[in-house]
């Protein structure tokens, strides 16, 4: 009898060990970055740690892709992956890295701004770790679906109350949210260090224009919108008007003065750069969604959001076709293109002329067409 119990205990222990080992492999697989394949327009790749050496060799460090034109001009910083559970922002930045060239000016692209947050998922959300996009040759590109917050391995524990550098108080969990920690602290929490590194880049490289790419829940009021620092109001208005001429509806939201830590507020207040943040609707991160699957991430089809739309509960259009990733990336890329067109009209002495920006219709028809195959 005692031997039988001993055998059961050993069998149970072995089963637990197998589960733990398999879970560990799954967890650590998130630490490996899916490749980004730079196009011919990328002239240099640096690491963010160049602007804050203390993050070198940590999971906070991330690539900065530089697209430099033959002619001098303005300097543009494009941020993707501030929130890695908002893949439309990440993929729009990747599309720029893999396709775009500069004729004048310089573009700095950070597709995985909060790199650490790509290495895990939000707890208890049941989200997929990865999603894939098919390319015209039948191959697939794999990307990570991450978290809104910095990995606890890189930053733990969070305080009960987060005292922001401006003196404002926020919920303690916001210290893990990159878009609440700007302008950052070089010797602060890990997330603050990332914000400080990006802020140093803006200041040291004399960045003229910053665009931070996001997605928002369909039921969230700030949706399909340009959020702008007050200094960038005229630029945002011109961009909206030009987009509407192209048939792309987009809202304008001015950055709240008292809401601290956001890119558009803090970079705008602490530098000479014009700063905007773009939002596009994403059903896979909303609270009304059903099961969070890879298909929901890429296709954006959800029966609960369809019902919510019929009930008039959403702030973005939604029908049986869903809100696919192709469309979300297309909206971001088109808005950036028109934003730069508007910039060039307003500041002809600091132009940022780009070539090979994928067209809106082409991206809507298939994002995979504009992603480079992995050799």
Question: Where do the PLM segments sit?
Answer:
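C-terminal accessory segments enriched in acidic
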Residues: 2-66, 190-209, 213, 218-375
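Di-metal (Zn2+ and/or Mg2+/Mn2+) metal-binding site signature of metallo-dependent hydrolases
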Residues: 83-91
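Glycine-rich His-Gly loop
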Residues: 69, 80-84
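Short, solvent-exposed loop/turn elements at domain surfaces
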Residues: 74, 87, 285-288
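Active-site/substrate-binding loop(s) of hydrolase catalytic cores
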Residues: 87-88, 103-241
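A short, Lys/Arg-enriched amphipathic alpha-helix followed by its capping loop at the start of a domain
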Residues: 92-105
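Proline/glycine-enriched tight loop/beta-turn segments at coil->beta junctions
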Residues: 68-75
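Short glycine-rich or small-residue beta-strand-to-loop segments that form or flank ligand, phosphate
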Residues: 75-81, 110, 181
């Amino acid at each position: 009898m005692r031997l039988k119990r001993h055998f059961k205990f050993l069998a149970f222990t072995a089963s637990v060990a197998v589960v733990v080992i398999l879970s560990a492999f799954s967890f650590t697989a998130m630490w490996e970055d899916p490749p980004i394949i730079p196009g011919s327009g990328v002239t240099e790749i640096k690491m963010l740690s160049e602007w804050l050496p203390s993050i070198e060799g940590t999971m906070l460090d991330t690539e900065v892709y530089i697209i430099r034109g033959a002619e001098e001009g303005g300097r543009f910083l494009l941020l993707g992956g501030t929130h890695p559970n908002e893949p439309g922002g990440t993929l729009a930045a990747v599309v720029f890295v893999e396709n775009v060239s500069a004729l004048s000016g310089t573009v700095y692209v950070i597709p995985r701004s909060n790199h650490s947050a790509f290495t895990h998922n939000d707890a208890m959300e049941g989200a997929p770790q990865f999603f894939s996009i098919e390319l015209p040759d039948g191959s697939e590109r794999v990307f990570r679906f991450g978290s809104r917050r910095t990995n606890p391995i890189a930053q733990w524990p969070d305080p009960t109350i987060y005292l922001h550098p401006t003196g404002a108080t926020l919920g303690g969990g916001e210290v893990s949210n990159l878009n609440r920690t700007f302008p950052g602290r070089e010797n602060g929490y890990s997330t603050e260090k990332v914000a400080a590194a990006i802020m140093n880049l803006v200041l040291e490289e004399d960045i003229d224009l910053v665009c931070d790419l996001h997605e928002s829940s369909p039921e969230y009021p700030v949706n399909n919108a340009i959020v702008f620092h007050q200094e960038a109001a005229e630029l945002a208005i011109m961009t909206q008007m030009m987009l509407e001429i192209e048939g792309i509806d987009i809202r304008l939201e001015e950055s709240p003065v008292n809401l601290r830590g956001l890119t558009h507020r803090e970079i705008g207040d602490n530098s000479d750069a014009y700063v905007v943040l773009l939002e596009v609707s994403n059903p896979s991160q909303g609270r009304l969604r059903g099961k969070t699957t890879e298909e929901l991430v890429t296709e954006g089809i959800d029966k609960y959001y369809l019902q919510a739309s019929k009930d008039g509960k959403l702030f973005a259009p939604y029908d049986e076709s869903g809100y696919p990733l192709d469309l979300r990336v297309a909206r971001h890329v088109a808005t950036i293109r028109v934003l730069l067109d508007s910039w060039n009209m307003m500041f002809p002495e600091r132009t940022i002329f780009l070539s090979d920006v994928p067209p809106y219709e082409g991206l809507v028809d298939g994002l995979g067409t504009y992603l480079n195959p992995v050799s």
